[in-house]
């Protein structure tokens, strides 16, 4: 190899190295989502499974979360949209151990809970609940559930997906007034407050003087921990099956 050819080859390698370095910086600043969320019109079979919600098929969609490395979806569900276009998860199935976005909930269980809220709360009552549950209460139970969150705080994302979390929270927070964040922050503060009297008073203020009920699910503890990890930590461990 002549000196000139060696020089050209060396320059080419340097340029190629800078190109790789530049791409690494670009990829770091513009991370590609490690998963894909797809929405599709609900099938006839899926619509039949969720008849208990009393919503027309036109308001329902099927949702699927998948990655290119897995042949089967990581999570599937049924969502509804309200007049503002907000997505409301009604049914959720996680196909992996770690919850993806939401905890598992079946159509039968969700319909039973929402029917109980409708049956046991006065029509003028205010139900305070996590933002996804609030949407379902408004849509299906027909009760005032004013809390919502444009930031969709508490969405359950695996740690490896944290870089894409903002885009996914924006999807679930779409259609929600940004002003809702203040009341939802106060709701989380009340749930974490160790002073019961002060927490109760804060919840009453959120209900604006109307009869108030608080609907809290076990899964809300997970979402609260995801939203406020510095104040609430939850750990879990898988135990091998023993025979």
Residue ranges and their predicted role:
Residues 8-25:
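Hydrophobic membrane-insertion alpha-helices, especially the h-region
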Residues 25-31:
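Sec-dependent signal peptide cleavage junction
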Residues 1-6:
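Short, Lys/Arg-rich N-terminal segment immediately upstream of the first membrane anchor
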Residues 16, 31-243:
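Extracytoplasmic
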